[in-house]
Amino acid sequence: MALKSFNPTTPSQRQLVIVDRAGLYKGKPVKTLTEGLSSKGGRNNLGRITVRFQGGGHKRTYRLVDFKRRKFDVEGTVERLEYDPNRTAFIALVNYADGEQAYILAPQRLAAGDKVIASDKAVDVKPGNTMPLQFIPVGSIIHNVEMKPGKGGQIARSAGTYAQLVGRDQGMAILRLNSGEQRLVHGSCLASIGAVSNPDHGNINDGKAGRSRWRGKRPHVRGVVMNPVDHPHGGGEGRTSGGRHPVTPWGKPTKGKRTRSNKSTDKFIMRSRHQRKK
């Protein structure tokens, strides 16, 4: 899908660049594959703000997307591609041979009428097909990769993302991720072939603040323009630079400070995403 720009009738129209979604289905989603989604506004069950700068936005219906792909050896036909307001990628409605329907993440070059299949054995290497990493040819571009067998895909699910299978070692698959990280994943974990749809998502320009508000994003206020009671960078006469290394509102270092603390999975990371930056 291409990018779409508009005649400069207003300042926001002049700057607006969006993804042309003319090829997507224009109707409502399948009702049995949807759930209600209540707006949280960044609040928890106590009503306290736990995530700042969220709230408002258009009402959404949640689409139940099948990230597990455990319906083995039943061929499915793609009925249509749809927009999903809950993610940056597009989704595909699949009609299986046994009459069941499901939404899956749509990879690039998947179109209505295409056949897809998931299996615990080797199947054709074509977009949308799913199989264990141990059967996928080295060098393949993949997405929706499981980190634990049966848990469902967790890696490479966002628009335009993918991982590359670069090798195998003692029952483990070696993946290169978008971030530059090289990681070991068990060979029995499932992955889908292809890169995720909507690669132009990274090139859009909202054109105006209102388009962020429609998504439920509120203005992100900088610490240096707050009062001292609200932020460590706050206060001062006139404009100040904050006067210290950048910190969060709670005084923790930010802007590049590494926060990863899961030591138990360090052994699965062959190459850190930070190594290439040094």
From Swiss-Prot:
Q: Which GO terms describe its biological process?
A: cytoplasmic translation
UniProt-annotated stretches for the region Disordered? 201-278
Check the record and name the InterPro entries matching this protein: NA-bd_OB-fold, Rib_uL2_dom2, Ribosomal_uL2, Ribosomal_uL2_bac/org-type, Ribosomal_uL2_C, Ribosomal_uL2_CS, Ribosomal_uL2_dom3, Ribosomal_uL2_RNA-bd_dom
Q: What are the protein's UniProt keywords?
A: Ribonucleoprotein, Ribosomal protein, RNA-binding, rRNA-binding
- Basic residues compositional bias, start-end: 210-221
This protein's GO cellular component annotations are: large ribosomal subunit
For this protein, the record's SMART domains field holds: Ribosomal_L2, Ribosomal_L2_C
Please give the Gene Ontology molecular function terms for this protein: rRNA binding; structural constituent of ribosome; transferase activity
Superkingdom of this entry's organism?
Answer: Bacteria
Subunit arrangement? Part of the 50S ribosomal subunit. Forms a bridge to the 30S subunit in the 70S ribosome.
Regarding protein family, the annotation reads: Belongs to the universal ribosomal protein uL2 family.
State what this protein does.
One of the primary rRNA binding proteins. Required for association of the 30S and 50S subunits to form the 70S ribosome, for tRNA binding and peptide bond formation. It has been suggested to have peptidyltransferase activity; this is somewhat controversial. Makes several contacts with the 16S rRNA in the 70S ribosome.
Kindly provide the name given to this protein in its UniProt entry. Answer: Large ribosomal subunit protein uL2
Taxonomic lineage from the root: Bacteria, Pseudomonadati, Pseudomonadota, Alphaproteobacteria, Hyphomicrobiales
Q: Which gene encodes it?
A: rplB
